[in-house]
């Protein structure tokens, strides 16, 4: 990730992707309150990732928008999952905490974001371990798989959002 001032083209790209997301998300929302929660999630994530770019040079916020679009269009999840998809990298990559998300977006969305953060931690730890000892690697992979399956026990949406990620 890198930081650099967004250009007019960057803002136009963000607006187009956001409009595309909202077009897909509105039918999944039962009322205007749910729509506004998606809007609030986007605005919060957009501000948290302001002027942050991916290695490709693209504005970082495009990634969470794309994940949210997959969550709604290909998996068919509802507004809480859309919000969690938009917010999933805020806790991982900024100074915000799960508690901040809970205070702003409620327990359920915070729980989804927390689950996504925990899965990322498990997967990142596995990547760092390397393949020095095959049996310990297999044991570590089995343990990580078990942790991911336990996440399913909390809320299957966490794994579905992670698949979209």
Name each model-derived stretch.
Residues 1-164:
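Active-site helical microenvironments for divalent-metal-assisted chemistry
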């Amino acid at each position: 990730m890198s930081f650099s001032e967004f250009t007019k083209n960057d803002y136009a790209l963000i607006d187009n992707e956001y409009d595309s997301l909202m077009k897909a998300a509105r039918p999944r929302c039962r009322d205007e309150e749910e729509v506004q929660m998606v809007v609030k999630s986007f605005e919060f994530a957009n501000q948290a990732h302001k002027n942050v770019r991916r290695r490709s040079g693209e504005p970082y916020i495009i990634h969470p928008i794309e994940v949210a679009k997959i969550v709604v269009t290909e998996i068919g999840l509802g507004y809480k999952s859309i919000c969690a998809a938009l917010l999933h990298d805020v806790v991982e990559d900024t100074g915000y905490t799960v508690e901040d998300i809970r205070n702003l977006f409620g327990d359920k969305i915070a729980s989804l974001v927390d689950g996504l953060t925990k899965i990322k931690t498990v997967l990142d730890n596995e990547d760092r371990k390397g393949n020095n000892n095959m049996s310990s690697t297999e044991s570590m992979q089995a343990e990580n798989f078990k942790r991911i399956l336990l996440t399913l026990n909390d809320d299957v949406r966490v794994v579905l959002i992670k698949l979209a990620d």
